[in-house]
Amino acid sequence: MGQAPKRLPLSGSEPKFTQKMWGRAVGINNNNCYAYAVGDYEKKRSYKSVPGERAGIKNMNHSYLSCMKLPQRVIADNPKRVYMAKAEEKCKPGHYKVMMFIAPGKPTNYFRQGDFHFYKQVNEVEYKVKKGNTHESIAGFFKVPLTRVKKAMPKLVAGKIMRFKANIFSHKRGWATGPLVTDAKGKVIVDPRKASRDYPGLNYKKYCSSFCVKNKGIKVGHTHSKVGKKA
């Protein structure tokens, strides 16, 4: 067997992975990866949230071909509630880890446009048992001890929700999906930097930064009042 992947440190303030709200039609269609990563759920958004918008940055145009000034824009959206950190660093109490990547895009005859993507660290996982699941298959998929899975639900029942701690990362692919814990190859995400991020048309191959985000009160996008501080 291969070596178990190294988990990144927890602060104890990580959100739970759940499909509630975020995985329903309203949650899927109005909350992109940025909003999901920072926990800013909204029932109605006219367009997707982008870093720096809430900060009121004058020139919002960004090609996302590089990470230039993107981390600063994220911080400017929620000053004093978000700070940059190393990926291996433990966040302060009341904060959790978020990572940002970009897909530089592919050159065309006319333009080149990239994209950004965010992942957030979660600890407790709500998992809906599927037909054919075994304790061994669930433990193997999430890369957690078998005893932990058996304790969470001694007798597996398809369709029921089980809860256990996994210390993994979750993300949401724009307005196209609900919350996910799998990468582009369908594997559970223990560390986004080591996960597959190559999707058809978008390869989020460039790691920009890690942040520690306060676990409540974060707002992004056009649906909230401006911070009033330019970055």
Predicted features by range, described:
Residues 2-4, 64, 114, 219-230:
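Extended terminal accessory/targeting regions
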Residues 131-133, 148-164:
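Short acidic, glycine/serine/threonine-rich helix-capping segments at coil-helix boundaries
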Residues 125-145:
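Primarily a LysM-type cell-wall glycan-binding module
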Residues 158-231:
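Active-site or metal-binding loop neighborhoods of secreted/extracellular toxin and effector enzymes
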Residues 2-81:
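Cysteine-nucleophile protease catalytic domains, especially the papain-like/related folds used
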Residues 62-125, 166-176:
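...with weaker cross-activation on analogous glycine-rich loops/strands in unrelated enzymes
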Residues 33, 67, 113-115, 134-137, ...:
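Short, charged amphipathic recognition helices of the HTH superfamily
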